[in-house]
Amino acid sequence: MYFLSIPFPNINPEIITFGGFSLKWYGVAYVVSILIGWRYILIISKNTSIISKKNIDDLVIWVAIGIILGGRLGYSLFYQPSEHFQNPLKILEIWNGGMSFHGGLLGVIISIIIFSKNKKINILYISDMLA
């Protein structure tokens, strides 16, 4: 039955290392995804006056912060709670890995709510753009 299985690829998580700094595939995926989303939102909102380009730029920053903070806090609370409650400063050690999708999603939702209230833009319009 082994011949029917697909072997799991053994991919090095680091793309390149410079001394103590290493560039990881996971981080590159985050950056590329945010940049593609930013470009997409600029394209679909080009023919509308509901949201300005400056507000879109601000929204992308809010979303990126929501992804990082929410993903890291979600990982800390859902997967390593006892370790992070004993040493809360470990939550800040993002270079050691640990992000959760559902934490990032909650972070984005919270950041969109805050952004829409601050800029007085309908949250349904923003949610529709990001969907």
Feature map (PLM): residue ranges:
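Hydrophobic, membrane-interfacing alpha helices
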Residues: M1-A131
